[in-house]
Amino acid sequence: EIAQCLVGSEMCIRDSNTCIGFAAEDTPAGTMMHSHNIVFEHVDLDYAFSRDYHPTELLPPEQRATFQGFVRPDGWVATRNYIGILVASNCAATVARKIANHFTPERLAAYPNVSGVVPFVTGLGCGMEMTGPFMDLLRRTIMGYATNPNLGAAIVTALGCERNNIDGMFEHAGLQESETLQKLVIQDVGGTAKAVEEGIRRVEQLLPVVNACRRQTVSAEHLVLALECGGSDGFSGLSANPALGRAVDLLVKNGGTAILSETTEIFGVEHTLTRRARTPEVGQKLVDHINWWLKYNEGKDCQINGRVSPGNNKGGLANVLEKSLGGAKKGGETALNEVCLLY
């Protein structure tokens, strides 16, 4: 950033009309502004709940964009049609990878409607407490992937003695086995090699089932776009993120949904979202959630404060406010309709 005018000591530094810090000293016009001369301090935010809210003008159904999607029995629509091999713990990761790796493009050539066979593994699931928020989060994540519309079928593998018991995980999610959602326990089938063989056999049985689902023309209103920052630098808020924001506005106008995830990434600029919240109550939920994060991180080594990672700083971001400002631009200018508090 370059100072556009003379900036007096302790004056507010604004980016996109949002305060990202204060001048450490008198700074002449033309001076580079970065972490060496921008001081991070607490800024009183004007949430102005719902002041700028405008209902989105949706296109009539007959004018909305379409795409070729896979329609699922429950009404969800997928953009891909994978068979997923998931794990209850890291103990089953090798088995999951070996099963998935068996299905090369050549072996899948006879099933053109199958996007692939892919492993979803984790380093967790064993050597951790059996109850509490971390196990709950792991289970919701695994079963969330298993039931994602982009999976036409899923096999969840487990060693059998891990802390994340596979039966408990299914029960926690309120799910039962079916033709397209199966359990595979390594100890029950006789070890790693036999589990790989059994997994391959099951996938071979699932391939014609999943392949029977074909793409069809559907409205863009079925699309759900998840937004996440990655590798932020000084240009993210000028290029990639605003471009995503524009795409979000177009998607919502066509009846679709966008989710601005990782609420910690908007710390310090949440007032730019509360102003366009559908109701003051929705805006307050966002503020409450940011405050929850601040409380949750007390005493931990991952404080939400003014610092950014060395890579972010080297890339041109002075502090977390500037990073958050760029990250929030992924949400476009569409109204904030709801805040999900489940983490």
PLM region spans:
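Alpha/propeptide regions of enzymes that mature by internal proteolysis
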Residues: 9, 14-22, 26-28, 32-34, ...
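Terminal amphipathic helices with adjacent charged low-complexity linkers/tails
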Residues: 42, 171, 183, 267-268, ...
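Short, Lys/Arg- and Gly-enriched loop/turn segments at beta-strand edges
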Residues: 29-32, 41-48
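Short, well-ordered, mixed-charge alpha-helical segments that flank or form enzyme active sites
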Residues: 42, 162-166, 190-194, 232-236, ...
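Single conserved hydrophobic/aromatic residue that forms the stacking wall/gate
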Residues: 1-8, 13, 343
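Flexible inter-domain linker/hinge segments
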Residues: 47-84, 207-212
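A generic local secondary-structure boundary/capping motif
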Residues: 22-24, 70-76, 142-146, 211-217, ...
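Anaerobic metallocofactor- and corrinoid-dependent redox/one-carbon enzyme cores
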Residues: 66, 73-92, 96-97, 103, ...
